[in-house]
Amino acid sequence: MAQPYMKKDDDDEDVEYSPFYGIEKGAVLQEARAFHDPQLDARKCSQVITKLLYLLNQGETFTKVEATEVFFAVTKLFQSKDAGLRRLVYLMIKELSPSSDEVIIVTSSLMKDMNSKTDMYRANAIRVLCRIIDGTLLTQIERYLKQAIVDKNPVVASAALVSGIHLLQANPEIVKRWSNEVQEAVQSRFALVQFHGLALLHQIRQNDRLAISKMVSGLTRGSVRSPLAQCLLIRYTSQVIRESSMNTQTSDRPFFDYLESCLRHKSEMVILEAARKIAEMDVTSRELAPAITVLQLFLSSSKPVLRFAAVRTLNKVAMTRPLAVTNCNVDLESLMSDQNRSIATLAITTLLKTGNESSVDRLMKQITNFMSDIADEFKIVVVEAIRSLCLKFPLKYRSMMNFLSNSLREEGGFEYKKAIVDSIVTLISEIPDAKEIGLLYLCEFIEDCEFTYLSSQILHLLGNEGPRTSDPSRYIRYIYNRVILENATVRASAVSTLAKFGALVDALKPRIFVLLRRCLFDTDDEVRDRATLYLQTLDGEVAVGSTEKDVKEFLFGSFDVPLANLEASLKTYEPSEEPFDISLVSREVKSQPLQEKKAPGKKPPAGAPAPAPVPAVDAYQKILSSIPEFSGFGRLFKSSEPVELTEAETEYAINVVKHIYSSHVVLQYNCTNTIPEQLLENVTVYVDATDAEEFSEVCSKPLRSLPYDSPGQIFVAFEKPEHVPATGKFSNVLKFIVKEVDTSTGEVDEDGVEDEYQIEDLEIVSADYMLRVAVSNFRNAWENMDPESERVDEYGLGVRESLAEAVSAVISILGMQPCEGTEVVPKNARSHTCLLSGVFIGDAKVLVRLSFGLSGPKEVAMKLAVRSDDPEVSDKIHEIVASG
């Protein structure tokens, strides 16, 4: 083995390098020739194998020839009687993963070791054999493996059981035949054998709930003695309790009693596992109390691992049931000064969740002394906990905002500073009294901020919120400093922010004009262009609208064209005398190009430029407008994503795309024939619109021929009332003439047979008439909507699994675009606000504010507020929700 390389540094301190420092594959392969020596040197061979294993584990690749040569050389080492070398040989064979041809060569040696009198040889031979053999060879050694499972030596039995766990993935039918032997292993007096036996038995039965329930019921009566196996059994027991929700509560009681009994076990790991599982379950406060008591005792343990496990579990409980953890607050406060920073961090964040309003100031003082000693990742956790606490006790915002401000001045990375800024922004938006002090803290931060992203984000916030404060002029100095001192990106953001102050605060407009004129001499094009645009807009020289409201809409309004769609349209735009018309750009957020199924293996040539993405509506518009029957339908409003009408792996793959016009709907059926021996001709879809009374079929375009694996389209058009979100259910039958094809010659029989194929029903729902269009600033967009168009009502959504499910269901019904990440519901939240935007058929902009709350154990109530360009559309949104 290579000797450690020693080196003296300038401070005369010894630096010890890895014993493998500087080894090369070529040199090690040369050394591997020692395996062929007639007189084997076990020590030298062990060193060479160790180097080979090191290279393999470092990701070094061996060619096929190199791997084969090493494998054959290693097999020569079976003649050595050195136990240490033999164990390395086993490892080497596993790492090389020999091919099926090479496995035969080593199988006989491993079989011999598997029947050896040396237990170490037997155990390792079993592990290696099960790693390298296939199903055919497995049947030949199955008898030996079953015997090994019940072997008296625990090392051999564990090796066989662990091998069974690995083999179960590829050869489940064979391993399932070992159930009797595995059950016997579960009763073993050896801890590891019982642990591995229980793990394998559970995997064998994992798809049979009744068998798992019976297994758990039998084992919970006291036959499991191994602490490791006890931990597994606790997990399986909690799984049975969760899955038996259909049964009465009484039937779960024996299982829960077992979990409670484990809280009094002599093994600490069993106690912790039981407490953790009880804490994760939906139990009453009385049932949870024993687990909390046990965890509280562990908080004062002398073992760091027990303190960490206990405080981590309590931290999770505090997220959903903070009152249950309040009794532990005194012990948690003592852990804030724990030498282990992970324990201290968890203790602090738990206290922040369980603390009351009177303890906030004391907690903040302790946290201040603590923050400098922990890493950024832990600081982020603390900052997020403080944000939640501030929202819980808004009257304490001053002390917490002051803490966040001080944290901004400390050293830290981007993610840490971003977490603080995001927290301050959240508090500004949720606590009105905190707005001005929060904005000032952010202004002080950007005076010495090294992160361009954060500076731009804060400047954007200042532009939106600053003009609405009591003294907007106090922010101008901070903003203009960015124009003087920062990079081009931040300077451009600062110019836009100044313009917003000029537009909204008339008293500041002359001063803003002076500052913007100075920006006309900036070295960066973007900064100069923005300054020019805003000066001419605010001065009235460039007409962006007839009223002051139009000017503010220009400055503050949301950009309702997705940037990806705009980019695609600009790439296809050909410079001409006509100006670029942004109204022609698709406003759909989720764009999906129309793609045909490619033959397998066909890829674009290397280096070929990727085609620019084309919004789905643009692609479909070109196809539909080229069909004379549809050319008079007008502008395509929306195309849905494909809806599958057949199961996977069926004879014919069919999906449908719904194309929505103002007074028509076109159904595009995309069909693929997956049977090589068939050719389909005169293919059409018969659509029954009996359950869609407002629709009447006007025309259809059948498919003349549908060869194997060549997609084709069938179109069926319906007329409906103009600008009305008509809904209905359509049943579909695919009809065609099928002809046999000789796959060897490609010849098609002349005679065909009429046939039909029933496919799934299709529904046109209200969400199909809504475009998912985002707004960049929901608050400004909402305020700019006519308040007279607002309609508000409350609804009961019934029993739901969670608020997240309720939010997802309403978004799905409306088909609108969530804004500002509000579709994500914080875990265990009891109330939530979701903001949605979209464009309803007839090009009416719609904004929705949804307020959810839990009115009972799982009863969800919702308040729906809608604003729109058209008050009638606001009423329709309420009708959709009421009928949904």
Curated annotation (Swiss-Prot):
Q: Membrane-crossing residues?
A: none
- Source organism's superkingdom? Eukaryota
User: Where do Pro residues bias regions lie?
Assistant: 602-612
* Keywords annotated in UniProt: Cytoplasm, Cytoplasmic vesicle, ER-Golgi transport, Golgi apparatus, Membrane, Protein transport, Repeat, Transport
Biological processes per GO annotation: endoplasmic reticulum to Golgi vesicle-mediated transport; intra-Golgi vesicle-mediated transport; intracellular protein transport; protein secretion
Which membrane topology describes this protein? Peripheral membrane protein
One matching Pfam family is COP-gamma_platf
Q: Which GO molecular function annotations are given, in alphabetical order?
A: structural molecule activity
What stretches of residues are HEAT repeats?
65-100, 101-138, 286-323, 325-357, 358-395
Q: Where in the cell is it found?
A: Cytoplasm; Golgi apparatus membrane; Cytoplasmic vesicle, COPI-coated vesicle membrane
Query: Can you name a GO cellular component term?
Result: Golgi membrane
The reply on keyword Cytoplasm is yes
Q: Which residues lie within the region annotated Disordered?
A: 592-612
What is the first-listed, main subcellular location in coarse terms? cytoplasm
User: What does the subunit comment say?
Assistant: Oligomeric complex that consists of at least the alpha, beta, beta', gamma, delta, epsilon and zeta subunits.
Q: Which family does it belong to?
A: Belongs to the COPG family.
What is the annotated role of this protein in its UniProt record? The coatomer is a cytosolic protein complex that binds to dilysine motifs and reversibly associates with Golgi non-clathrin-coated vesicles, which further mediate biosynthetic protein transport from the ER, via the Golgi up to the trans Golgi network. Coatomer complex is required for budding from Golgi membranes, and is essential for the retrograde Golgi-to-ER transport of dilysine-tagged proteins.
Q: What is this protein called?
A: Coatomer subunit gamma-1
